From Swiss-Prot:
Residues 3-237 form the PTS EIIC type-4 domain. The keyword Transmembrane applies. Keywords: Cell membrane, Membrane, Phosphotransferase system, Sugar transport, Transmembrane, Transmembrane helix, Transport. InterPro entries: GatZ_KbaZ_carbometab, PTS_IIC_man. The chain crosses the membrane at residues 1-21, 92-112, 133-153, 177-197, 219-239. The phosphoenolpyruvate-dependent sugar phosphotransferase system (PTS), a major carbohydrate active transport system, catalyzes the phosphorylation of incoming sugar substrates concomitant with their translocation across the cell membrane. The enzyme II SorABCD PTS system is involved in L-sorbose transport. This is PTS system sorbose-specific EIIC component. PANTHER family: N-ACETYLGALACTOSAMINE PERMEASE II COMPONENT-RELATED, PTS SYSTEM MANNOSE-SPECIFIC EIIC COMPONENT. One of its GO terms (biological process) is phosphoenolpyruvate-dependent sugar phosphotransferase system. The keyword Chloroplast does not apply. It is found in: Cell membrane. Signal peptide: none annotated. One of its GO terms (cellular component) is plasma membrane. The gene is sorC.
Length: 277
């Protein structure tokens, strides 16, 4: 498929939003599930965008910045891989093979962009000494634009200068050992990502629910949506039966009914005029 001028403009705008989202973290627009889905919608194939985004999201679950160490750039990997997969009419496995090296290249661009923005922060410090708030605001927005261009420029270059025929021939030229190896590595990364998250979320008194999910999953043929609903129900029931929640409810924080019950059970909690009567 050929990319129209309107699509190129929308790609530039959306990739800029994705780049800013990678440092703002407020709306999570840099996450693969969101970035790929919207990019797929722009290119007219939201289904492929959602599938690719969900697959890359599993891989990127364990990616996180630790101190000054930058994780692979899921934002740039999401935008470029979606364009190459949809425009080049490739499968999801090829998209994973594309995304992993692009994420590594984006990691270098992230370090470079963050290094450049340090100069803007020092300039903002100097303006703060002069109480020049307008300049401080503009300097912060300018630093944010650097993060936007970090993703939008490479993505737009790929969308403008790489034709579908070139994409197809380039990806088809990759040896099977490379694409297959990257696909297997991507599967390992998914497992590692899940393991890291489960290790952080590991709470002994919640582990029975975790094991119960595997047991039920082996016998009940339910969809992921149904399992999500079952998990939500278990969570609600657990919170309602939790002694801490019950204590707060009995103390009156759960509503007017709880307050009346607490007052009836404890005469000392009644007003003084009622005690005098």
């Amino acid at each position: 498929m050929a990319i129209s001028t309107i699509q190129i403009i929308l790609i530039f705008i959306w990739s800029s939003v994705v780049g800013m989202g990678s440092v703002l973290d407020e709306f999570q627009t840099h996450r693969p599930l969101i970035a790929c889905s919207i990019m797929g919608l722009i290119l007219g194939d939201p289904k492929t965008g959602i599938i690719l985004g969900g697959t890359l999201e599993l891989i990127a679950l364990g990616w996180m910045n630790i101190g000054a160490a930058q994780s692979p750039d899921s934002a740039l990997a999401s935008t470029i891989s979606t364009i190459l997969v949809i425009v080049g009419n490739q499968d999801i496995q090829k998209g994973i093979a594309i995304a992993l090296p692009v994420a590594a290249a984006g990691q270098v661009l992230t370090v470079l962009a963050r290094t450049v923005t340090v100069a803007f922060q020092h300039a903002a410090d100097r303006e703060a000494e002069k109480a020049n708030f307008t300049a401080i605001i503009w300097l912060h927005f300018t630093a944010l634009i650097v993060q936007a261009l970090r993703v939008s420029i490479p993505t737009t270059i790929v969308a403008v200068f790489v034709s579908p025929e070139e994409i197809k021939s380039m990806l088809d030229a990759l040896p099977e050992v490379i694409t297959g190896g990257l696909a297997v590595a991507g599967g390992f990364i998914v497992v590692v990502g899940y393991a890291m998250i489960l290790n952080m979320m590991s709470v002994k008194y919640l582990m029975p629910f975790f094991y119960q999910g595997f047991v039920l999953g082996g016998y009940l043929k339910l969809s992921l949506l149904a399992w999500g609903a079952v998990g939500l129900i278990f969570a609600i029931v657990y919170v309602q039966l939790n002694p801490k929640f019950a204590t707060n409810h009995n103390n009156g924080t759960g509503g007017s009914g709880g307050t009346v019950a607490a007052a009836g059970d404890h005469p000392a909690a009644l007003p003084e005029d009622e005690l005098d009567d």
